[in-house]
Swiss-Prot record:
This is Translation initiation factor IF-1. InterPro entries: NA-bd_OB-fold, RNA-binding_domain_S1_IF1, S1_domain, TIF_IF1. It is found in: Cytoplasm. Belongs to the IF-1 family.
Length: 73
């Protein structure tokens, strides 16, 4: 997993699946964010379903949107 400079990584649970590979994720601290799948996860056909535990990478500029970078098994 390549770490991006200044990005915040936090764990959460997928609440619902939205169109265009977007997901609503509830973070461990209670906040809800909108997240999309990272390109590497798309390339390797990693499927994400509601109730999956994931790691979300948030930008310090917009804490309401993020990128799903890892799905726990």
């Amino acid at each position: 997993m390549a770490k991006k400079d200044g990005a915040i990584e936090i764990e959460g649970t997928v609440i619902e699946s939205l169109p265009n590979a977007m997901f609503r994720v509830e973070l461990d601290n209670g906040h809800k964010v909108l997240a999309h799948i990272s390109g590497k996860m798309r390339m390797h056909y990693i499927r994400i379903l509601p109730d999956d535990r994931v790691v979300v990478e948030l930008s310090p500029y917009d804490l309401t949107r993020g990128r799903i970078v890892y799905r726990y098994k």
